């Protein structure tokens, strides 16, 4: 119970901090237009939590890797936060500090980066993770991750890159998908993951995260 209260308190504090910072970051935009300076200011703001090269950050709250991500996926998720289809109090505030015409340019800026994976996963059943990624688990009605995310796990268009994604973020996100992701099928396709992750055990989730987090 104490851990839950601490997490709630820290989330609230972080949300307050980022709300204030978002207001300051808006000063980088000129008349709401996606100027080069405005986009760069937003990028620098993203690195506050996601790391200097958007490589992600391991901490009490794992921040996902945005570097090298599919630009259309980034655009879709920012709009999902704006429309409250994706639930996260911190990112909801952050997204509201980005003007709509900035979203494509910011997504392209993040997509162009390619830092090495953060690494540091605890060590687990990599072979199982590779099997799930490449072939799925037919007996559990879990399709191969590679079928959508590609053999290199770099995704395509609205399908996200998961190669090099932080182990801790992957485990956390896959574990709570039904409550924080995929609220409806419009206008992105995040909802299709719900039946897939529901059929994975915790051990399988950890093995999968272990495998993909090391991919380049």
Annotate each predicted stretch with a short phrase:
Residues 36-39, 53-86, 92-97, 146, ...:
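Gly/Gly-Pro-rich "capping" loops immediately C-terminal to redox-active cysteine motifs
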Residues 2-13:
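Bacterial N-terminal signal peptides that target proteins for export
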Residues 25-43, 55-62, 112-139, 160:
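Electrostatic cytochrome c docking/interface patches
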Residues 52, 83-84, 113-116, 135-136, ...:
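Generic structural signal for alpha-helix termini and adjacent loop/cap motifs
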Residues 38-41, 45, 73, 90-93, ...:
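Extracytoplasmic/secreted proteins, especially bacterial periplasmic and envelope-associated proteins
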Residues 44-52, 106, 142-152, 208:
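The canonical Cys-X-X-Cys-His
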Residues 11-21:
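Bacterial N-terminal signal peptides
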Residues 96-119, 168-171, 195-216:
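C-terminal capping alpha-helices of c-type cytochrome domains
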